[in-house]
Amino acid sequence: MSWQAYVDDHLMCDVGDGNTPASAAIIGHDGSVWAQSANFPQLKPEEVTGIMNDFNEAGFLAPTGLFLGGTKYMVIQGESGAVIRGKKGSGGATLKKTGQAIVIGIYDEPMTPGQCNLVVERLGDYLLEQGL
């Protein structure tokens, strides 16, 4: 299966009631884009560095916030070294780190944070099981 198929079929999928993430991507730890939805924001190198720093040192992004394509998200409870969650108004983002990649989902209402977490973390867990 291509990386784009993972994004299209497993991240940008209907989670019920017609809700889908607003955008999603799978990127390498170096920030290289493996696959993304059409409207996923272009990440800046310093944003990827901040994300990786937070995965390596929990709480790194808390003082400054999580930035994705220049949009700031308030960092909320995640899982140290594995999951970063951000909130912005009625939307937010979930990031799951695997051995080689970062799975990212960005959502807006009516999708709930829990629905986005489920979609992103389920794919991330699968990739981890596959050694990716």
Swiss-Prot record:
One of its GO terms (molecular function) is actin monomer binding. It comes from the Eukaryota. It holds the Pfam family Profilin. The keyword Membrane does not apply. SUPFAM superfamilies: Profilin (actin-binding protein). It is found in: Cytoplasm, Cytoskeleton. GO terms for cellular component: cell cortex; cytoskeleton. Keywords: Actin-binding, Allergen, Cytoplasm, Cytoskeleton. The keyword Cytoplasm applies. Gene3D superfamilies: Dynein light chain 2a, cytoplasmic. Occurs in many kinds of cells as a complex with monomeric actin in a 1:1 ratio. Belongs to the profilin family. PANTHER family: PROFILIN, PROFILIN-3. Binds to actin and affects the structure of the cytoskeleton. At high concentrations, profilin prevents the polymerization of actin, whereas it enhances it at low concentrations. By binding to PIP2, it inhibits the formation of IP3 and DG. This is Profilin-1. It comes from Parietaria judaica. The gene is PRO1.
